[in-house]
Amino acid sequence: AKIDKVSLDVVFAAQTAWQILLAAESCNNLSRFDGVKYGYRTAEYKNIDELYVKSRTEAFSFLTKATIIYGSDVLAKDKYESCYDKSLRIRRIVLTKVKELLVSYDAILTPACSRLTFEPYDTKDAFTKVFDESLYTAVASITGLPAMVTGGVQLIADAFNESTLLSIAHSVEKEEA
C-alpha cells in the first residue's frame, strides 16, 4: 500500500460549517418531537403549549437543547445567508477538495479524535467539547462520503467505495493484532 502525507486545508472550514448545518438540521428534525405524535410525552400538562414545553424539557438533554437553540439562531432571517447558506457553499467546496484528493488515492486516513482517553466533564461543557472533537470527523460528516473509524483512525473514501473502506479497515485491524 502506498501512503502519502497530504494537506487538506479545508478542515477548519468544514468543522464550522458542519456545526452550523448540524444545528440547523437538528432544529428542524427535532421539531416534530412534540409529545403528541412523536417522542416522549410528559405525564402532566394543562394545555397543548405546556405539553410541548414539558415534553421537550424532560426528554432532551442539555446538549440537544443547546443545539436546537443554536440551530434556531443560524436559521433566523438575519443570519440565514451569512450562516446557513454560507455553510452550504462551504460544504460544496469541501466535497470538491476531498474528491480531488480521492482521484489519486483510494482513501484518506485521518485521526478520529484528539486523544485515546477522555476525562469526565460537566454537561455544560459538552457543546464546546463536542465542537472541538468534531474537527476530526467533520470532513466526512459534511461531505456525506463513506467513512468509518477503526483502530483510532478514520478512513474516508469516494462515493460507492465502501468495499475499499472495508478492505483497508481489515488491513488496519490486522496490523494492530
Model-derived features with residue positions:
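Short low-complexity, flexible loop/linker segments enriched in glycine and/or proline
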Residues: 17-23, 125-126, 155-156
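Short, surface-exposed loop/helix-turn segments at secondary-structure junctions
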Residues: 18, 43, 47, 81-86, ...
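Glycine-rich phosphate/pyrophosphate-binding loop
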Residues: 41-66
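Short, active-site-adjacent cap segments at secondary-structure transitions
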Residues: 11-13, 115-118
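Gly/Ser-rich, acidic/histidine-flanked active-site/gating loops
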Residues: 1-27, 32, 36, 104
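Structural helix-boundary/capping segments
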Residues: 2, 32, 37-39, 66-96, ...
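Small-aliphatic-rich amphipathic alpha-helix that forms the alpha element of a beta-alpha
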Residues: 98, 127-147
